């Protein structure tokens, strides 16, 4: 009986070793399937300046004050002030005409990587931290699902008639973009030495502490810029910088993005006409 059991056990061991050897041979014979070339994800290449300049521009509107003004106000101030009723009419007209607001990340992706945009894109920007941009402008925009970019002059935060830190945080948390606009609105063309730290770095750091998000976009006070400013702005990680209606720089189009001021004298028809005529097709 013992001999029979030993013989059976020996047979089992031989069979196990044979199967294991066969399985190992099968594993060795398996050749991985070749990776198809069209499934290899390649790194996107960035468009050069010439390519960016050829792209159709997105209309970008620039607002400052949203408040009534008297008949005796100067022509200059009329360029920076829009009646609340006029602003409301402009937002409704944009919505009724099929426009969709976009944000700077979308604009950057479109310009640099040929990313998609809605059929009728528009960008709404607000300069200088005025409180009514939050209490009137943002409220009106929310009716239509619109989002905006708020360029914050940090010296004004928490001052009368300007936004508080809490309001800025609320705008950011609700899907709008908070961006840089210097500390005290001095022209970047006049900066020297420590000015770059005071006007660019510290405001960027403060706004990041308020929003909890990177500050990646910037607007030049008065729309004025020079090559030194572009270099300093790029060195601080800004992806786009916005001017006003002057031509884009042929070598740095991402840092000379054009906008048009919306003056208090415009009708909605005038706004649409300016959007059509001010940006390339």
Language model region names:
Residues 6-14:
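Sec-dependent N-terminal signal peptides
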Residues 16-18:
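C-terminal motif of bacterial Sec signal peptides marking the signal peptidase cleavage site
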Residues 124-125, 178:
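Residue-level marker for buried hydrophobic side chains located in beta-strands
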Residues 151, 181, 241-243:
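Short beta-strand and adjacent tight-turn residues that come in two discontinuous sequence segments
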Residues 138-146, 163-180:
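Acidic (Asp/Glu)-rich catalytic clusters
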Residues 161-168, 195-199:
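Charged helix-capping and loop-helix junction motifs
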Residues 64, 181, 185:
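Histidine-centered divalent metal-coordination motifs
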Residues 23-124, 131-132, 190-281:
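C-terminal active-site subregion of NodB/CE4 polysaccharide deacetylases
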